[in-house]
Amino acid sequence: MAQAGGAGAGAWGRRGAGAGAGPERAPWRWAPALLWLAAATAAAAAAGDPSRRQWPVPYKRFSFRPEPDPYCQAKYTFCPTGSPIPVMKDDDVIEVFRLQAPVWEFKYGDLLGHLKIMHDAIGFRSTLTEKNYTMEWYELFQLGNCTFPHLRPEMNAPFWCNQGAACFFEGIDDNHWKENGTLVLVATISGGMFNKMAKWVKQDNETGIYYETWTVQASPKKEAEKWFESYDCSKFVLRTYEKLAELGADFKKIETNYTRIFLYSGEPTYLGNETSVFGPTGNKTLALAIKKFYYPFKPHLSTKEFLLSLLQIFDAVVIHREFYLFYNFEYWFLPMKSPFIKITYEEIPLPNRKNRTLSGL
C-alpha cells in the first residue's frame, strides 16, 4: 500500500485552482452522491482481535510524513501560496477569528452551504503589524481520494492517496468567508501564546498525516457507542482552539456548529492490515470482497456508469448492510445499521480557558 505525502512544514500554503490532471476522485459527483445516499438510507427503514477493542479506536500518529507517490495527483493544487508561520512579538495582541464557508464554495457558491456542508479554518490578525493570516487543514488530493482507494490493475491491494495537512498563508479572503459563511472574532491572545501555538501546529501537522471522513458510531443517539472518530478540517480547528485554551485563551460565548458525516453500525470487526489481508498468505476471499466493495467508488467515465455504481453502493450498504473501513492503515468490517449514513451540522461549544494566568496581554 502506498500512501501519498509531501506536506511537511515547508510545504504549507494556500489552496488554489491550479491543476495537475491525474486520478483525482471527482468531487462534483461524489458530493451529491453522499447526499443522495444519506437521503436514501434515511428513507430505508464478530468477533475481532480482543486487544483491538478500545472504542473509539485511537487515531494513529506517525514520526514523519512520507514523500508523495507520483501516482497521486490533485485537481486543485494544495497550498500554492503558503508561507511559514511568522514569529510574533510576545507583547503583540493577536485577534483569533472563526472562519467557515461552504465546501467547494469557489466552484459551487452557496450550494453546499444550504445543506450545511461546511469547511472550517482559523484567522489571525496582528495588532502591531496589522497583517492577517489564515490557517486551515485539508486534503492533499481532494476528498474522494481520502475516502476511497484506487484499484490499480498492477497491484493486488487497494492503493490509497490519503493525506491531510496544515496550510498557512498571509491574508484573509473576507469575501470568501463572509459572503456565504462566517468570519467572527472568537478570542484575543498574546504574541507569545501565538508562538507556542505555532510550535504545536508544526508537531501536530508532522504526526497527524491522514484524513478521515467518517465518524462511526452505533446509533444517532448522543450517548451511543462511538467506534471511530473523523479527522478533518473541523477537528483541526477544534484541536487548535483547545490548545489555545490550554495556553490561556479566553473564548467568547458564541454558538459554533460543525459538519459531520456519520456511519452507523454494530460493533466493527478487525480484519487486518494490507499484508495480512492482501499479502501472499492473506485471505483471498476477504481481499476480493474488499475490492468488490470499493469498485463502485472508482472514477467514472459516463453518467450511466456513475448511476449504476450508486445502485451497487446502495445494495452493499443498505440492502446487505456492509461497509469496509480503512482506518489507521488497517481494514475493518462495519455491520451497517439504519439510518446507515447521516450528515449533521452540530454545535460544539468553544472551550473554556484552562490557564487563568494569561501572560503577555
Swiss-Prot record:
Residues on Lumenal side: 49-361
Q: Molecular function terms in GO for this entry?
A: D-mannose binding; hydrolase activity, acting on glycosyl bonds; transferase activity
| Reactions the enzyme catalyzes | S-hexadecanoyl-L-cysteinyl-[protein] + H2O = L-cysteinyl-[protein] + hexadecanoate + H(+)
Output a single Gene Ontology CC term carried by this record. lysosome
In its keyword annotation, does this UniProt entry include ATP-binding? no
Biased region (Gly residues) positions are: 1-21
Output the InterPro entries linked to this UniProt entry: CLN5
Q: How is it modified after translation?
A: N-glycosylated with both high mannose and complex type sugars. Glycosylation is important for proper folding and trafficking to the lysosomes. Can undergo proteolytic cleavage at the C-terminus, probably by a cysteine protease and may involve the removal of approximately 10-15 residues from the C-terminal end.
Site note Cleavage, residues: 45-46
Enumerate the glycosylated residues.
132, 145, 180, 205, 257, 273, 283, 355
What is annotated as the active site? 119 (proton acceptor), 233 (nucleophile)
Residue ranges in the Cytoplasmic topological domain are: 1-30
The catalytic activity of this protein is classed by the Enzyme Commission as 2.3.1.-, 3.1.2.22
> Which Cys-Cys disulfides exist here?
72-161, 79-167
Segments traversing the membrane: 31-48
Q: Which residues form a coiled coil?
A: none
Q: Name one Pfam family in it.
A: CLN5
Q: Name one GO biological process term.
A: lysosome organization
Sequence segments annotated as region (Membrane-anchoring): 306-345
Query: Region Disordered: start and end of each range?
Result: 1-24
**What keywords appear on the UniProt entry?**
Disulfide bond, Glycoprotein, Hydrolase, Lysosome, Membrane, Neurodegeneration, Neuronal ceroid lipofuscinosis, Signal-anchor, Transferase, Transmembrane, Transmembrane helix
Q: How does it assemble?
A: Multimer. Interacts with SORT1, RAB5A and RAB7A. Interacts with PPT1, TPP1, CLN3, CLN6, CLN8, ATP5F1A and ATP5F1B.
Q: Which disease is it linked to?
A: Defects in CLN5 are the cause of neuronal ceroid lipofuscinosis (NCL). NCL is characterized by brain atrophy and the accumulation of lysosome derived fluorescent storage bodies in neurons and most other cells. NCL is found in New Zealand Borderdale sheep.
Job description of the protein: Exhibits palmitoyl protein thioesterase (S-depalmitoylation) activity in vitro and most likely plays a role in protein S-depalmitoylation.
Q: Which family does it belong to?
A: Belongs to the CLN5 family.
Q: Give the protein's recorded name.
A: Bis(monoacylglycero)phosphate synthase CLN5
The gene from which this protein is expressed is CLN5
